[in-house]
């Protein structure tokens, strides 16, 4: 009587290993894409909050735009939103957020551009309503 050895062949094991590897790669690529989309949405939310803080609160009260923005002069905006997802404060080197005032006299500006660099899309830009 001969004993028959049961188990998987090398080909079967290799096939399963390749399949698991491909599934892992697909998972991590998809995970990265979701993280990038979430980060881009966070940036858009921050820029929109700053924009509406300037347009709906600051400008009606002062009739001008500030030369720089921070939680000191835009109290209606969550202070955490002035820091990009990488932890860099707006208008500092390496920040994903830029506030560019224009037509300024004595720190009182007539217009501005708010911008955020996005990874999956074109830059997100908001300009002042009152030019």
PLM regions: where:
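N-terminal single-pass transmembrane signal-anchor helix
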Residues: 2-31
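Short, surface-exposed interaction loops/tails
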Residues: 104-131
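Aliphatic-rich helix starts adjacent to a transmembrane/signal segment
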Residues: 17-18, 26-48
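Short, surface-exposed beta-strand/loop micro-motifs that present aromatic residues
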Residues: 94-106
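Short, glycine/small-hydrophobic-rich surface segments
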Residues: 54-86, 124, 128-131
């Amino acid at each position: 009587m001969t004993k028959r050895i049961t188990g998987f062949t090398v080909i079967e094991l290799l096939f399963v290993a390749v399949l698991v590897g491909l599934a892992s790669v697909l998972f991590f690529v998809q995970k990265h894409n979701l993280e990038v989309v979430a980060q881009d949405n966070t940036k858009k939310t921050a820029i929109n909050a700053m924009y509406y803080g300037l347009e709906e609160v600051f400008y009606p009260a002062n009739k001008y735009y500030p030369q720089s923005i921070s939680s000191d002069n835009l109290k209606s905006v969550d202070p955490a939103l002035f820091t990009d997802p990488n932890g860099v404060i707006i208008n500092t080197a390496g920040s994903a957020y830029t506030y560019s005032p224009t037509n300024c006299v004595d720190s009182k500006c007539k217009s501005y551009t708010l911008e955020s660099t996005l990874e999956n899309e074109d830059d997100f830009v908001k300009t002042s309503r009152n030019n």
